[in-house]
Design a protein with these regions (language model features):
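Lumenal/periplasmic acceptor-binding loop at the mouth of the active site in multi-pass
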Residues: 73-119, 298-404, 409-417
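Specific aromatic-rich, kink-prone transmembrane helix
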Residues: 176-193
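Transmembrane signal-anchor helices characteristic of membrane glycosylation enzymes that use polyprenol
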Residues: 17-71, 75-82, 244-260
Length: 436
């Protein structure tokens, strides 16, 4: 019978070894870190005067003023006044993961009279970036088999891509997601290389933190477990305790969290909107009846109804011209999760200008613009050189897949990529918002 204390000690030892920086990783990782320290400093300087204030409406202050390519500053809000303010069904545990940081920020606000949320987030982002870079290097070197110099160069290339750089300087959920996915790929890649098993507790732990941050990423942990375990994955014990129970538990928790925290707020908001609409109707009705020259009350009511319908239609048309409506594609259906799909935004142009364009090379026009504010969905490069560079990168990407077509690790990674491609490109979730 195994000693649970000894087993727990071994777990912490394994985790500690994974985060130990090796000699040949020091110079590349610190060089990358230096660049990202400068980038984070620029973000802090840009918003410090507004975001360091304590006695303000945090949501309005952060959401209205922060604008970097559409990324959301919700984490700034949560660390300033805690609550499950993320989309709960997409990020079920993220608010709880950052709760200790909220306590830290609250204590610092009491001590200094300043909101130091930017500095706290910057330190976390730099930690995530540093180890994401290291895990990427290790994947290239220890699993793919490249030399250390080549691994450092490829990692440097990845972390020089436009939206990777933005990911690690903005207070969104993408940085922790990327960190955990790279760590999972590294851990599972080593298991495949050494022909070792992915223990149930390892799969569960990775699933909780990955799916808890972004629910859809939990599917990638299931895929990783399948590739590592092979036929053993389908053993009833593994399926039940390492896969089924964590998946069901995560969904139950997200649903319970939604019903407890978000549903009452949404119901109250709908009630407030309804009351406001009724007040507006009563005000308009009274004003119309006081000023109309129609003496017959029934005819006056008909005339008011016609006038009110025109007012509602004009308001609807005006709302449809706003960026968040004008740039939205038509969904597959208008209810449930499928209401977030997009069947009309052009796929080819999305791939050229956004998926393999803006994410790698920022466009000169509408630089760091937001499609929900002031940026068109599609922006073209001024110079043909940008398209040549993009085409070269895509061709190298496809050539790399061909060269690694016999690699189990490659197909494990690309099946996860396939999930993202299906969700975002084929179904169109967030297709009109480049950063997603």
């Amino acid at each position: 019978m195994t000693n649970p204390i000894k087993e727990l000690k071994n777990i912490f030892i394994q985790i500690g070894r994974m985060f130990r920086v090796k000699k040949n990783e020091v110079i590349p990782s610190l060089s990358a870190l230096a660049v990202y320290i400068i980038l984070n400093a620029l973000i802090i300087m840009r918003y410090y005067d507004s975001f360091s204030k304590v006695h303000v409406a945090f949501w309005k202050n952060f959401i209205k003023k922060f604008s970097v390519s559409g990324f959301d500053p919700i984490t700034y809000v949560v660390l300033s006044t805690w609550g499950p303010k993320y989309d709960i069904h997409r990020h079920p545990l993220l608010a709880f993961f950052v709760y200790p940081l909220y306590l830290l920020n609250t204590a610092l606000m009491d001590l200094t009279g300043l909101n130091l949320v930017q500095f706290i987030i910057a330190l976390i982002l730099l930690f995530l970036m540093f180890y994401s870079f290291i895990f990427m290097m290790r994947i290239c070197r220890d699993i793919i088999g490249l030399r250390n110099t080549d691994a450092a160069l490829l990692s440097g290339f990845l972390f020089s891509c436009a939206y990777i750089m933005l990911t690690f300087i903005v207070p969104d959920h993408f940085a922790p997601s990327m960190f955990m996915l790279l760590m999972a790929l590294y851990v599972c890649g080593v298991k495949i290389r050494d022909k070792k098993r992915l223990n149930g507790w390892q799969a569960v732990l990775m699933f909780i933190f990955t799916a808890g941050t972004t629910l859809s990423n939990g599917a990638k942990i299931v895929i990783d477990a399948l590739f590592v375990e092979g036929k053993r994955f389908f053993r009833p014990k593994y399926l039940i305790f390492a896969i089924a129970i964590p998946c069901a538990g995560m969904w139950y928790l997200s649903d319970a969290e939604y019903r407890y925290y978000r549903l009452p707020v949404e119901q109250q908001r709908r009630a407030d909107v309804k009351k406001a609409s009724e007040r507006e109707w009563a005000k308009n009705h009274a004003a119309f009846m006081d000023t109309t020259t129609i003496m017959d009350s029934a005819e006056a009511e008909k005339a008011f109804k016609v006038w009110d319908n025109k007012r509602i239609l004009a308001k609807y048309r005006k709302d449809q011209k706003l960026p968040w409506n004008a740039h939205k594609g038509k969904p597959l259906v208008k209810k449930g999760m499928l209401q977030y799909t997009d069947m009309t935004t052009p796929r080819w142009q999305s791939l050229v200008d956004n998926v393999f364009g803006e994410t790698i090379q920022l466009h000169q026009d509408y630089l760091l613009g937001d499609t929900l504010r002031d940026r068109p969905v599609f922006v073209s490069y001024r110079n043909v050189v940008n398209y040549i560079v993009e085409a070269a990168i895509v061709l190298l990407f496809l050539f790399g897949i061909w060269c690694g077509r016999k690699s189990r690790f490659l197909w494990m990674a690309h099946l996860g990529f396939g999930i993202d491609f299906t969700v975002h490109v084929i179904l169109g979730f967030g297709l009109n918002e480049v950063y997603i």
